[in-house]
Amino acid sequence: MGLRSCTHFATLVMPLWALAFCFLVLVPVPAQTTSLQISKGDRRLQDLESNMGAESDQPNANLVGTSLSRFGDKRNQKIITFGRRVPRPIIPIELDLLMDNDDENTKAKRFDDYGHMRFGKRGGDDQFDDYGHMRFGR
């Protein structure tokens, strides 16, 4: 009876030990992941600085270093999303509805019934004849 209880106990404990081992090995510690990300960012920053130094002959290397460190920090703060970015219109839809876009009114002001463009509407409608031609001296 003692041997049977030991095997029963071993069959219960072995999967738990295997699960704990997998958890410890496969799941990274948050401190390790942040240090890895920082080291990757530093490596990218050094590569960018070396590339910028080779391409440009600027005496102000400190200014280049500070701008690149800001760029590196922003790259590390990038948020990972699950899909592509949806393009947004420049004018929001709500604002577009509130704006007065009467194309018919502007066409009526610019063109007569025959499609001729009317220029210089300071004098009113009597300045033009029925065909859209300007009247002079009448």
Swiss-Prot record:
GO terms for CC? extracellular region
Q: Quote the Pfam families the UniProt record gives.
A: Sulfakinin
Q: Does the keyword Signal apply?
A: yes
Pro-peptide residues, renumbered to this chain, are 34-73, 86-108
Organism listed in the record: Drosophila teissieri (Fruit fly)
Q: Which UniProt keywords apply?
A: Amidation, Cleavage on pair of basic residues, Hormone, Neuropeptide, Secreted, Signal, Sulfation
Q: What is this protein called?
A: Drosulfakinins
In the record, what terms sit under GO molecular function?
A: hormone activity
Q: Where in the cell is it found?
A: Secreted
Q: Where are the Phenylalanine amide residues found in this chain? A: 82, 119, 136
Keyword hit for Secreted: yes
Q: Which family does it belong to?
A: Belongs to the gastrin/cholecystokinin family.
State the function annotated in the UniProt record: Drosulfakinin-0 (DSK 0) plays diverse biological roles including regulating gut muscle contraction in adults but not in larvae.
GO BP field:
neuropeptide signaling pathway; smooth muscle contraction
On this chain, the residues bearing Sulfotyrosine are 114, 131
Query: Main location per UniProt?
Result: secreted
Range of residues in the leader sequence:
1-33
